[in-house]
Amino acid sequence: MTTVDIGRYKRLVQYFWDPEPTNNIASKSPIWCLGEEYLVSDKSSPSAVTESPPKEGGYLLAQSLSTTETTTPPDSTVGSLESSSEYDNCDTASTDGGWPTAFLDDFEAKIWLTYRSNFPAIAKSQDPKALSAMSLSVRLRSQLVDQGGFTSDTGWGCMIRSGQSLLANALLTLRMGREWRRGSSSNEERKILSLFADDPRAPYSIHKFVEHGASACGKHPGEWFGPSAAARCIQALTNSQVESELRVYITGDGSDVYEDTFMSIAKPNSTKFTPTLILVGTRLGLDKITPVYWEALKSSLQMPQSVGIAGGRPSSSHYFIGVQESDFFYLDPHQTRPALPFNDNVEDYTPEDIDSCHTRRLRRLHIKEMDPSMLIAFLIRDENDWKDWRRAVREVQGKGVIHVADRDPALHGLGAERDGAIDEVETFDDDDDDTVLNG
């Protein structure tokens, strides 16, 4: 008897007809977005929301004054239609699908950086190995279309874009506060976006990521990045900024965070504490996230210091910023838009330029469908923040994905790993992660 692949037909139907998801969690579970909690009302109105009481160290909730509408082409979602959902922006509250309006406003306020096209060319590598490191589609495009260099990162830049989004939102929180929503402080937002313009003059442009990836991470232009390479680029590019307002601590090939090393970056020579971005590169299983880590991973997005998760999607990378029960909400970089220009005068950015960096469309993915290779980020603003975060990491339910210790054994000549480290979180190297996190 012939076996019928029902899933194949389901994906085909969803390719042409993908209904809007609704907030149909029977328990009316709260929704979390980078440390902010949104409670769902039991009232009949699908858009009604009950705001949670202030949390210790929490932030005020706000609503935006504007919305944007975006469209993702079918070719960027066909591989995930069965397990992901989309939400199209609508102007009326009655069509919000049961999602709290305050949550949608918060989601929309996050900076969303995607594939871009028609930017100044990124020169190809002359290394004979560079061509074989590209995917077949990128290789063909480079030979037939981008013969003079890469003018688009479509097909290979998704991890870079996820990393850019993560860094941009860390800067957004640092400069404008967690409570910021669209419709205010537009010039300050433009200043942040200009840092990520698709131009080699912008300090956090894709050109700069590719340049450092080639020189320090062994990544050729047009080659997929993994979380490890993205973290190293974020750290290097941030450190290259004179009088940077932000510092970056990366865990390297492990999930252990050491206080002495962290403080040497955030507060060198016992000087004033500088806000520091912690980037934890980890792999929480082989092909799927091991269930024992589920609760701890959910908790990472509930902490006030959370800046999200980059990676974590089979065959691609996304930027995860929210969670409800076991569903994770994310911003998808797999949509090609015109290049974001570099402007010396930030007032020259048009409303269309700004709108292209935001979306009100929700996408969600069950944790069992997520790829285990990822970059988890936290913004530590001061020493009290550090103490709160360290306590929260220690108190998570389930098996922890992050471990904090007082001293780095390598710095003190101890030469010993933390007990049980080998048996816990599986880490990755660049050869590993890039096989699963492609653009």
Swiss-Prot record:
Q: Which reaction does it catalyse?
A: [protein]-C-terminal L-amino acid-glycyl-phosphatidylethanolamide + H2O = [protein]-C-terminal L-amino acid-glycine + a 1,2-diacyl-sn-glycero-3-phosphoethanolamine
Q: Where is the active site?
A: C158, D332, H334
Tell me which EC number(s) this protein carries.
Answer: 3.4.22.-
One cellular component term from this protein's GO annotations in UniProt: nucleus
Question: In which residue ranges is the amino acid composition biased (Polar residues)?
Answer: 78-91
Molecular function (GO) terms for this protein are: cysteine-type endopeptidase activity; protein-phosphatidylethanolamide deconjugating activity
Segments of this protein annotated with the region Disordered = 65-91
Q: Which UniProt keywords apply?
A: Autophagy, Cytoplasm, Hydrolase, Nucleus, Protease, Protein transport, Thiol protease, Transport
Q: Does the keyword Transport apply?
A: yes
Q: Record's SUPFAM superfamilies? A: Cysteine proteinases
Q: Which GO terms describe its biological process?
A: aggrephagy; autophagosome assembly; mitophagy; piecemeal microautophagy of the nucleus; protein processing; protein transport
Q: Where is the composition biased (Low complexity)?
A: 66-77
Q: What does this protein do?
A: Cysteine protease that plays a key role in cytoplasm to vacuole transport (Cvt) and autophagy by mediating both proteolytic activation and delipidation of ATG8. Required for selective autophagic degradation of the nucleus (nucleophagy) as well as for mitophagy which contributes to regulate mitochondrial quantity and quality by eliminating the mitochondria to a basal level to fulfill cellular energy requirements and preventing excess ROS production. The protease activity is required for proteolytic activation of ATG8: cleaves the C-terminal amino acid of ATG8 to reveal a C-terminal glycine.
UniProt-listed PANTHER family:
CYSTEINE PROTEASE, CYSTEINE PROTEASE ATG4
Q: What is this protein called?
A: Probable cysteine protease atg4
